[in-house]
Amino acid sequence: MNIAVCDDQLEELKAVESLLRMWQEQQHAAVRLHLFQNAGALLEAARKERFTLYLLDVMMPGTSGMAAAREIRTFDSAADIVFLTSSPGFAYESYGVQALEYLLKPITAKKLFPLLSRLYLREQKPQE
């Protein structure tokens, strides 16, 4: 799995990174993790490298996570997008970018691990 995480709050970014590393160790999963504190840097990287999963904060200064997701969909329709946010107010809008999940902060192992496991298993299945 090639995962991009974007959150303008460093503490939140590090907390999600810690959860992802914990899941990776528990599952012995092959994961490449990329962390971004703004959507501009994320989008620049996403145009150069394909990520299989985007974990995006919704409310960020400058380009929001929702706007970043719309931009990602212009060049990558296959990647999974999951929003990690403190605001339930954008859940409906997330359908417009075919978001897989909309998780409310604080993000916990109980919320994140089943999702990661499901995606990892799907990725490991041979394509028919």
Language-model segment annotations:
Residues E44, F51-P126:
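CheY-like receiver
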Residues C6-D7, F36, Y54:
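Conserved sequence signature across two-component system core domains
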